[in-house]
Amino acid sequence: MSDAQQVPAIVILGQGALDTARRVQARYPGALVHGLAGRVEADRSYTDFGDTLRELYCADHPIVALCAAGIVIRSLAPLLQRKGAEPPVLALAEDGSAVVPLLGGLAGVNRLAREIGEVLAVAPAITTSGELRFGTCVLNPPAGYVLADLEQGKRFVADLLGGQPVRVEGTAGWLDAARLPRDPAAALAIHVTPSARAPRAEELLIHPRCVLAALEPADAAADAVRRMLVDAGLA
């Protein structure tokens, strides 16, 4: 997980899941295990599983639920048509034998699943086409990078999956290991640049986070820094 992303909430229904939950918790300092009241002693107790998942989801909090995937899907289904935050959500078998990413492909759920899979020594059940084919999700850059336009990015990846080649302009080490269909003469381009501009057609524009400014929380200089970035043409 990136440094900026919250640690997951680990939600269990009974005592049988507690050992696995504690193993996952050890991977994420600060993570809490939420347990059903009267069934298991955990860090926090809840009385309604569905309400708890929905509250965490609406708060944009990553969720690791140790139960059947169907229970998680039915609990969150009323929220899935709403636009807004979609945090990573995955289902984990109580015995740690299966790790299933469900939601949040653009929020790092596959990365979370791989991390948990390493802890439990199991391969996560990743189904994201782009990640399986290219070895990375170009729409979910690692810490230190950000997409300029997510919606354009979705169309871009659809073209890649359709078989179009791509060229990479700029430097990003995480792209070097990707299994992208590269062609220096390709019409599609991944452009890594700090320059603030609108993406061109057939381009995936990625900005590296390369400016550091130390300010107090209420420092009026924050607005001045933003203006300086705009004046310098930096994203």
Please describe what each predicted stretch is:
Residues A4-I10:
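Extreme N-terminal starter segment of soluble prokaryotic enzymes
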Residues L13-G30, Y46-D48, T52-L56, P62, ...:
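Conserved mixed alpha/beta catalytic, RNA-binding, or beta-rich assembly cores of soluble enzyme
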Residues G30-R44:
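A short beta-strand-loop structural module common to alpha/beta enzyme folds
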